[in-house]
């Protein structure tokens, strides 16, 4: 049944009904409160009420540390979100097992460590990593601008995450910072129990934000890696946009998505990840701004989904903002994110500043209104990392 359900067209049509059921079932449910906490290989601290988790060491050590730090929130989220959204846990577990052989050994070690320390166990933890490939359930909007398109010239990447909260996920957003032993440090925005990343940035100043693309059920498969893991690997293994594009062109994924890339060298690319091809559109000094939502743009790769109506409307807003010629700054990007937020499911807004190695996040109840942003500074993400010289010059010249 799970396999048949995954192959059915237009899964997005079932989401409003699931949201309504969960709103009733989760009435009064609350995520356990976040609090400062330490583990042998990590710590959780609150920055202006935003949970920021650091884990370090081997994959198993990082998994165990994360499980110890957010296990309580993870168990609640699995119970009131994953099992509520998709009650056929047994069927979904069979699909997750199909994806398991394609997972890197190190990632499986991390899942095992996380499952043991969080109290979920390995199988439930594995299901969490495959959940978003089995159940496509997010809509997003992104915009990147740099050089002549921004007031200071620095590169900025803004993203909306529109994701059904089911009355609980909005309270579970967190920042995770990975410090793997002897390797590149990277960070991202996620939820407890989800070890992959949908948005993030590494210490080399490479940032990304992904968007699901609907309408391609016939070509999608399970013979690949979960897309949140793929994007986490981009941040772990690549230092700039060029390297990220080369990695994505190997097509390790099995679900159609778009991704916006930006690096502190003021390079950006919109990459449309079709099953047959990664379609790359790069920015340039002559084209210093790009926008993207939830559909493919190239003829021959498009396919209808009911999300197309919202996706094209949001893309139109972003493109008109670019075409206006008005330069972008952080406040203008925030205003655009508010304008393109989807009612009832907008739970995260993020502005990445790769040259400063920092970002601003706004989490909370679904809303299309204004949000309060919290800056997660370089010192909290990547201690002792160095921002770009171009950013220092641009910022020092501001009036």
Predicted regions, residues:
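Gly/Pro-rich turn-and-neighbor structural signature
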Residues: 123-158
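C-terminal, well-structured catalytic/ligand-binding subdomain of enzymes
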Residues: 2-118, 147-156, 160-399
